[in-house]
Regions:
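C-terminal edge and immediately downstream basic/flexible tail or linker adjoining helix-turn-helix-like DNA-binding
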Residues: 81-85
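Positively charged, aromatic-enriched patches within helix-turn-helix-type DNA-binding elements
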Residues: 3-70, 75-77
């Protein structure tokens, strides 16, 4: 159970596997814009067909759990992770 936990401001937050994988991908290269297609491929796999809204829903859930300030939507392209100053 502990393997999908993140720590924000000394607070432990448990995440479902896909949310954790999405956060892990985006935070691996802060300020890099990840295209939706690349996110789908890396998190869900090339063989899995998921709707466009799937990524949006997972990002929304991450924003609710760890904070909106960490994610930026690049309209029509994808998302990027932002580290606080």
């Amino acid at each position: 159970q502990d393997k999908y936990k993140v720590y924000i401001d000394d607070k432990s937050i448990a995440l479902p596997k896909k949310e954790f994988e999405l956060l892990s991908l985006l935070s691996s290269k802060p300020d890099k814009v990840f295209r939706r297609e690349k996110i789908m491929e890396k998190v869900w796999g090339e063989k899995v067909i998921v709707g466009d809204r799937t990524i949006d829903v997972h990002i929304r859930k991450l924003r609710e759990k760890i904070g909106d300030k960490y994610f930026k939507t690049i309209k029509g392209v994808g998302y990027k992770f932002i580290i606080e100053e």
